[in-house]
């Protein structure tokens, strides 16, 4: 339930679907397991997994959803070798090379032959929508997977007006300024990990861990025109994370002081515990994202189309 990696996107028009509307649309595109000759399926599952029975779980106006993708794993090297075998056999039997169309047919036939024996990989991706705060937050370390979820949601809703938020001043410039000026605003404090790039396409990359980011050694990297592309931060004595220069948020860790707020929930009541955890987590993340964006002079409503 606790998100560990975040990509968040802002709506360019207010999110107009109610919980009931969203449930109806998602229920029309539920995940189903793969058949023996199918290569992939992507659909919605219960937001609370085996403990729930709805595609949308709501808490304090935030809508939790979950997409599942199942893919058959077909090693490209195996397919390539089998195509080569068929091409060689054709040359031996007919004394000619295979055409492009024939190679494509070989690949299709081989894939169909291998699918029933292939292993499957299943990936679940949670997200929540906060209409009040005008954002959708996706629990993924991969931007591609985050955008896959957005594409699936757009497909079932017919439209999904969202976009990344981009600051006027590049994020890496602001992050570098934090170290140069030895200060951050708001409730943020520096951690002890960072990654620096040197200017130029073939510039050096420096990664530091367990190190004071205001030390003389770090200053020497900054003086050598290296800029920050990742930096460890803490927020409001509530969570730690790695901020990337595309505003992706990695390795989110909520501190015990947050988890302990739900210690009074009966651990045997799984649904109540999941509901309380989601309400707590989404509330904290909403505040966190709003305050993080403020460090870049942005708001979650910046992209809303003006009437």
From Swiss-Prot:
Pfam families per UniProt: RdgC
Domain of life of the native organism: Bacteria
Cellular compartments annotated: Cytoplasm, Nucleoid
Coiled coil: none
Protein's UniProt keywords contain Cytoplasm: yes
Function of the molecule: May be involved in recombination.
Family of this protein: Belongs to the RdgC family.
Name of the featured protein: Recombination-associated protein RdgC
Gene designation: rdgC
């Amino acid at each position: 339930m606790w998100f560990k990696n975040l990509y968040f996107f802002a709506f360019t028009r207010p999110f107009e679907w109610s919980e009931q509307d969203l449930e109806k649309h998602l229920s029309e595109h539920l995940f189903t397991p793969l058949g023996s000759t199918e290569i992939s399926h992507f659909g919605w599952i219960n937001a609370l997994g085996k403990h729930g029975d709805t595609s949308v779980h709501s808490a304090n106006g935030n809508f939790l959803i979950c997409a599942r993708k199942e893919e058959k794993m077909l090693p490209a090297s195996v397919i390539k070798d089998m195509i080569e075998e068929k091409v060689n056999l054709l040359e031996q039997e007919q004394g000619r090379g295979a055409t492009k169309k024939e190679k494509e047919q070989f690949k299709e036939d081989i894939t169909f032959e291998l699918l029933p024996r292939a292993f499957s990989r299943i990936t679940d991706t949670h997200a929540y929508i906060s209409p009040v705060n005008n954002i959708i937050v996706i629990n993924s370390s991969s931007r591609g997977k985050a955008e896959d979820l957005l594409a699936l949601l757009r497909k079932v809703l017919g439209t999904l007006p969202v976009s990344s938020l981009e600051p006027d001043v590049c994020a890496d410039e602001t992050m570098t300024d934090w170290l140069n000026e030895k200060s951050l605003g708001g409730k943020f404090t520096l951690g002890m990990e960072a990654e620096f790039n040197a200017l130029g396409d073939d510039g050096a990359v420096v990664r530091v861990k367990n190190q004071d980011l205001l030390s003389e050694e770090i200053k020497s990297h900054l003086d050598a025109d290296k800029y920050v592309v990742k930096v460890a931060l803490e927020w409001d004595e509530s969570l730690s994370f790695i901020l990337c220069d595309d505003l992706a948020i990695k390795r989110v860790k909520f501190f015990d002081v947050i988890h302990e707020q739900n210690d009074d929930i009966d651990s045997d009541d799984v649904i109540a515990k999941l509901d309380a955890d989601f309400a707590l987590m989404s509330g904290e993340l909403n505040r966190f994202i709003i305050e993080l964006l403020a460090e870049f002079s942005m708001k979650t409503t910046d992209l809303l189309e003006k009437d």
